[in-house]
Amino acid sequence: MALLAEHLLRPLPADKQIETGPFLEAVSHLPPFFDCLGSPVFTPIKADISGNITKIKAVYDTNPTKFRTLQNILEVEKEMYGAEWPKVGATLALMWLKRGLRFIQVFLQSICDGERDENHPNLIRVNATKAYEMALKKYHGWIVQKIFQAALYAAPYKSDFLKALSKGQNVTEEECLEKVRLFLVNYTATIDVIYEMYTRMNAELNYKV
């Protein structure tokens, strides 16, 4: 769990404004999460998350004051790009980033909730499938869906996944899951607010890749 516990997201302020700098710093440590899943087929999600973080940071770095919060980014780009928005810039990058982050959230929450295949309780295929279907599947075309279905069957045993997540530390499964639950508190709240922001600003796009 060391992988997640070292970089907790900040608690949300009362106004639910997410500061861009600290957010990008925290999520920039998440791509190695996909290495814990073992299969190289998860590499595209890892690369997508890394690439979108880089795109958002490039915009943020041009004017950290103007782009202080994630909402600032959407508001400024909406005015800047006009009819092209939200299909451009950091707005588009954050739209895809939140989906990758949601995959991680649903996957970890499903494991913490004890959801499993009773016939194969040490497999995490059920958890990974739920996360993919909730976060990413509807944005993927048929070919990409087939690739990920293959990846889900290559997912590691839960015990091996939790060991990788703990960076080999000698901790019990319950200790690891307790730290995952702690990580999920601010992480889930933050992702929920980003989704709400996209809905409120009518910035969500449903095209497939």
UniProtKB/Swiss-Prot annotation:
An example Gene Ontology biological process: intermembrane lipid transfer
Q: Where are the sequence repeats?
A: 45-55, 56-66
Tissue expression per record: Detected in brain, kidney, spleen, lung, cerebellum, liver and heart.
Record bears the keyword Protease: no
- Keyword Transcription present in the record's keywords: the answer is no
Summary of the function given for this chain in its UniProt record: Accelerates the intermembrane transfer of various glycolipids. Catalyzes the transfer of various glycosphingolipids between membranes but does not catalyze the transfer of phospholipids. May be involved in the intracellular translocation of glucosylceramides.
Q: How does it assemble?
A: Monomer.
The protein depicted here goes by the name Glycolipid transfer protein
> What organism, scientifically named, is this protein from?
Bos taurus (Bovine)
The record's gene field reads: GLTP
